[in-house]
Amino acid sequence: MEITIIYGTETGNSESLAQDARAKLTKLGHQAKVVDMEGITVEQLKNAGTLLVITSTWGDGEPPTNAEALHQELKDSSEDLSEVSYAVFALGDEFYENFCQAGKDFDSFLERLKAQRLLPVVLSNGDHDDTFPKWVDAIAGKLSCCFFQISVILSSKER
């Protein structure tokens, strides 16, 4: 099962975290790829299988520049993403009124399009040295559990 990790960033933090997630998940035996949000469409997300969204919030609650087009496309979309499971890690600063708004938006859009949430959205206030590894571990646990359940079902059908 391939994992698609998309990131929205202005300063490179989300991209760095996306690469860290890919490295950890690959080490655990998962296939994972990292994609800049600027290079992906909602149509492509339909085939993502498992989608991890890592994004910061910029300005007054806006998505980063490289995430603007996908943000708008998801907002306007009526695609059925029910075959996609996802999790969102949002970076922000609690000092701002619209703390982690871009991440909250992506979570809301994906839920509205019937994507299956793996974990509640994580809102990180600059403390991602602690929260991010736990988030990746939780995702790995969910994916391993799902893979095990699929394997058991397939094995029992072979009998």
Predicted regions and their residues:
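FMN-binding flavodoxin-like domain, especially the glycine-rich phosphate-binding loop
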Residues: 2-4, 12-16, 24-34, 42, ...
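Glycosyltransferase specificity loop/lid
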Residues: 39
